[in-house]
Amino acid sequence: DFHSHILPGIDDGSRNLEQSIYMVNEAKNVGFTKIISTSHYMENYYEVSQADRKAWLNGLQYGLEEKKIGLSLYLGSEIYFTDKIISLIKEAKASTINGSRYVLFEFPMNAKPINIEDFVYSILSANYIPVLAHPERYTFTQEEPEIIYQLANQGVLMQSNYGSIIGQYGKKAQVIVEKMLENNLVHFL
């Protein structure tokens, strides 16, 4: 699982350790063997340091081992759109995916950000690989799906939600993710 919110009390995901263990066990029961914890990082809202998230991740991994739930956890962040994205990574506030060059980011859900191309260029020019979280769910990409293709042509990889495929996020998201799948534009689920 490339995108999850399993760390307790960090963002809008799990509320406590018991819920985190339950969520991970459910993922294991449907076949997952590895989960990347991608807690939100949003300036002035969700600002838990990489060191603190790593400590929570280690605590959760220990809890899983105690309960004999064999599944590997990795650290990452889902970084909210900001022109400071590179400095957040370099200052160890936000995390790349498991210390790699992959950077998971998200846009505002209901507004098209300005300077998208400059934002993507800043990630690429710092030698990172941008990965856009759930492109099928943004209002502006639902209105202008060609933006997804433009971003892909710029070098952005796409991470879609399984829930979009089954209609959990509405018909528009489902139609867009189906077209993305047809065009090999879903790189991670």
Model-derived regions, located:
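An N-terminally biased module of ancient metal coordination in phosphate/nucleic-acid-related enzymes
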Residues: 1-70
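Active-site metal-binding loops of divalent metal-dependent hydrolases
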Residues: 4, 40-41, 78-79, 135, ...
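Metallo-beta-lactamase
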Residues: 5-14, 145-152, 160-163
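Short, acidic/polar
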Residues: 17-24, 85-89, 114-116, 176-178
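Non-catalytic positions within long, well-ordered alpha-helices that form the structural scaffold/packing
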Residues: 28, 124, 181-182
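Extended substrate/RNA-proximal surfaces in nucleic-acid metabolism proteins
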Residues: 47-159
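Histidine/acidic-residue-rich catalytic or RNA/ligand-binding cores of hydrolases
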Residues: 142-149, 169-178
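Short acidic/histidine-rich active-site segments
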Residues: 186-189
